[in-house]
A protein has these predicted regions:
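Short, surface-exposed acidic
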Residues: 116-128
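Conserved, mostly hydrophobic/aromatic
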Residues: 111
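An N-terminally biased module of ancient metal coordination in phosphate/nucleic-acid-related enzymes
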Residues: 1-72
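Conserved small/polar residues in nucleotide/adenosyl-binding loops
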Residues: 135-139
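Active-site phosphate-binding/coordination module
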Residues: 48, 62-101
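Short amphipathic alpha-helical segments, especially helix-boundary/capping motifs
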Residues: 20-24, 82-87, 114-117
Length: 139
């Protein structure tokens, strides 16, 4: 049985919408994939709701970002079959989403300064379906 236990979708920094991952995995011969997006429970919720799709087992997972203060660097922890109702886990994901939003908004504003054809509103329209960013237009 072949599987990939670390796959990202557009719920975090992946390029493929979560709904299409199983069919791609099936075409490549995988029997199971773990939907392990960064600091969001969206992919785990999807996997719990769609345990098997296109003949591929969907394993609920989340990749949690943490910090190793002793070694002074960021770490990523893969968590399989997370309790999506756990208050501490939900709070961690909410905090990380706020940080990601602030960083994305700052990056978008910097891009607007460099490239007049780029607008934060256009970037928001392109990415809002992912559910990963919470941008409110100033207009």
């Amino acid at each position: 049985m072949s599987c990939d236990l670390h796959i990202h979708s557009t719920c975090s920094d992946g390029a493929v919408p979560i709904e299409r991952l199983a069919s791609i995995a099936a075409r490549t011969g995988l029997h199971a994939i773990a939907l392990s997006d960064h600091d969001t429970l969206l992919s785990a919720q999807y996997a719990y709701a769609h345990t098997g799709q296109d003949g591929v087992e969907l394993i609920p997972a989340v990749e949690l970002t943490g910090y190793d203060f002793e070694r002074q660097h960021r770490v990523h922890l893969l968590c399989y079959y997370p309790d999506i109702d756990c208050p501490a886990l939900r709070e961690h994901c909410a905090i990380m989403k706020e940080r990601r939003n602030a960083c994305a908004l700052q990056s978008a504003k910097e891009l607007e300064q460099l490239y007049p054809q780029f607008t934060t509103d256009l970037a928001w329209e392109t990415t809002k379906a992912s559910g990963c960013l919470l941008y409110t237009s100033p207009s």
